Structure formats: structure tokens, C-alpha cells
């Protein structure tokens, strides 16, 4: 019986001005990869991505529907515009990936100054891309064995590697804007959202923090289609709550409950707290989704309605805060 070769990841840091450095594009786009297609928990890969098209900013009008049972509305609020970073420069870092069969060195950018938040985000995304591509090329990534080798979700393995290397940024959860993230930034995997601190729960559509006895939403990943039927219209979003086996027709469905993420969204409405919104959009090639940061929203109201199977489903109406940069 042959013995498995181990997979080792190492980091080599050169002083400023040493080593050979290459430039990295400021875009967040990634090369084509194989597609995965779970709407909230699965991540996808595909063609080179670009920023989302501009969408009109509209007013938030009250919802009228015969399906609703009870509506819970938020009080009036005034929101301030959040600034967005503009520069696209990457700080210098050298990373070496070593396996038993080959060794590859990746060098990222060059800077004599401390990196800005934007530079840190672009650096870790470039590193994510390099680690992902190497794992995808390595035959061990497709073999059975330990957890690192057994799963076909290479993006999850990439996330594990970067976390062990301590390469995440914005690791502390926060409400509102995330340093280094611009409206319109495109991500190819939900695991990338965790690496940059935009949304820390790749397996859940609602992320939240605990403040005292309350859970307050920090971000949501919304998806059109499937069983969720999240909708967008001129700065107004209707988001379907979590739970109840909404998308899996093979499992028994249940009524959604006002707990965990759903409760956090309701609390965000009562406390007039900002929520980051990331859209999971179907790609033009229809081979999966990409994830676009849309900006900050406020939860205006929520209600319970019956789905096609007769189960209770929570719906949350969110309105985009005026004054933010549009998607470009």
C-alpha cells in the first residue's frame, strides 16, 4: 500500500525592496473554474467576473399584498452616507506553497508603506485565488482520505488554509461598512466573503452578532430564484427568512420560526440598525452564482405568509439607504 504524500503550506516574508514582485490587478475578478450551485450555502466558480451593472436608486414604498398575515413596521429613520474607498494597490507579500511534488512561490504587489484597508482586502483575495488554483491543480485535492482531501469544495479547503495562515482581514464582526470593501465588489465564492470580513457565515444567509441579550444582523446574502424568491426592485428588497427546508423538496418542510437569523433581522428593524446586503446573482453563462456587495440597507418591516406548501415563511422588506454610490 502506497503512503499518501503530505500537503504543506509555508510563508516566506521578504523585507521591503527584496525579492521579485509582480503586480496584481485591482479587480476582484477570478478566472474560470468549475461551477457549484447551492443558492445560499454553495459557492460557485466561473468566468472572469466584473462589477455589477448600475441599477436605479428608488424610494422605498410600503408593500401591499393579500398574502400577508401580520406586518411589523420599523419607525422612521435618518441614515448617513457611508464613504467607500477608491484606491486599488496591493501590499507586498511573498507566499510559498510546497507539496511533495512541486514548490511554487507567489509574490503579491510591492509597497514601502503600511497597507491600507483596501490593499489588505485585495491582497488576501489574490492570495485566495492563488491557493485555490494550486489546490485545484494538485491531484490530492481530488482524492479520498482526510478531510482536506476528501471534500470536493476546494473553496472550503482554501478558506481553511488561509485561516491557518492567519491571512483573514476584518476578523472582528461589525455593523455597517467594512474597511476596504467597495459597493459593487464582486466575489466568486461565499468563502471569500468570510476571508474579507463581509459575511462570516458561508453556510448561512443571515450573519449576526450578539450584543447583550440581543442578536443583531450584520449582513445577509440574498438570492433570486430557487425556493427563497428574494426580490429586488429600485432599492427595495424582499428577503425570505431562514429555516423550514425551503429549497430542499426531498425533505419535510416546516414552518419558519422567529429565531436565530430571523430574530436578528427583526431586532435590526426595531433598533434601526444597518444591514450589509450581498446579492447572489446568476451568471450570464447560467453556471452558478456570483456575489455582489450592494451596500447598506435598513429593515423596514416583516410579516408571515404561506408558501406553496402551506408553511409559514417570514418575509423581510429592506430599503437601500439613500446617498450611497450606485452599483457600477
From Swiss-Prot:
Location(s), subcellular: Nucleus
Cellular component annotations (GO), alphabetically ordered: nucleus
Main location: nucleus
Residue ranges annotated for the YDG domain, each copy included: 176-320
KW Nucleus (keyword) present: yes
Keywords: Nucleus
Pfam families, sorted: SAD_SRA (PF02182)
Keyword match Nucleus: yes
Annotated InterPro entries: H3K9_HMTase_SUVAR3-9 (IPR051357), PUA-like_sf (IPR015947), SRA-YDG_sf (IPR036987), SRA_YDG (IPR003105)
SUPFAM superfamilies: PUA domain-like
Cysteine disulfide links: none
Annotated SMART domains: SRA
Domain of life: Eukaryota
Transmembrane segments: none
Name of the featured protein: YDG domain-containing protein At5g47150
Amino acid at each position: 500500500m502506497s503512503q499518501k504524500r503530505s500537503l504543506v503550506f509555508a510563508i516566506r516574508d521578504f523585507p521591503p525592496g527584496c525579492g521579485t514582485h509582480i503586480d496584481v490587478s485591482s479587480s476582484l475578478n477570478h478566472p474560470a473554474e468549475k461551477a457549484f450551485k447551492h443558492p445560499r450555502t454553495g459557492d460557485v466558480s466561473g468566468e472572469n467576473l466584473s462589477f455589477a451593472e448600475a441599477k436605479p436608486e428608488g424610494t422605498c414604498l410600503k408593500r401591499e399584498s393579500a398574502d400577508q398575515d401580520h406586518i411589523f413596521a420599523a419607525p422612521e429613520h435618518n441614515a448617513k452616507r457611508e464613504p467607500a474607498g477608491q484606491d486599488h494597490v496591493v501590499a507586498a507579500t511573498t507566499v510559498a506553497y510546497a507539496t511533495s511534488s512541486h514548490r511554487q512561490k507567489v509574490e503579491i504587489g510591492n509597497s514601502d508603506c503600511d497597507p491600507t484597508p483596501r490593499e489588505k482586502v485585495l491582497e488576501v483575495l489574490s492570495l485566495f485565488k492563488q491557493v485555490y488554483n494550486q489546490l485545484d491543480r494538485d491531484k490530492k485535492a481530488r482524492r479520498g482520505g482526510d478531510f482536506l482531501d476528501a471534500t470536493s469544495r476546494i473553496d472550503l479547503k482554501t478558506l481553511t488554509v488561509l485561516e491557518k495562515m492567519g491571512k483573514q482581514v476584518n476578523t472582528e464582526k461589525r455593523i455597517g461598512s467594512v474597511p476596504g470593501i467597495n459597493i459593487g465588489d464582486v466575489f466568486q465564492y461565499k468563502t471569500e466573503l468570510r476571508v474579507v470580513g463581509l459575511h462570516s457565515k458561508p453556510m448561512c444567509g443571515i450573519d449576526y452578532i450578539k450584543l447583550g441579550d440581543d442578536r443583531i444582523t450584520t449582513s445577509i446574502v440574498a438570492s433570486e430564484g430557487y425556493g427563497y424568491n428574494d426580490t429586488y426592485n429600485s432599492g427595495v428588497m424582499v428577503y425570505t427568512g431562514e429555516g423550514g427546508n425551503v429549497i430542499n423538496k426531498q425533505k419535510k418542510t416546516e414552518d419558519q420560526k422567529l429565531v436565530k437569523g430571523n430574530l436578528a433581522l427583526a431586532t435590526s428593524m426595531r433598533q434601526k440598525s444597518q444591514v450589509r446586503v450581498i446579492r447572489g446573482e446568476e451568471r450570464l453563462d447560467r453556471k452558478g452564482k456570483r456575489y455582489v456587495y450592494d451596500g447598506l440597507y435598513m429593515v423596514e418591516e416583516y410579516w408571515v405568509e404561506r408558501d406553496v406548501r402551506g408553511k409559514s415563511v417570514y418575509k423581510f422588506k429592506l430599503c437601500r439607504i439613500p446617498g450611497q454610490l450606485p452599483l457600477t
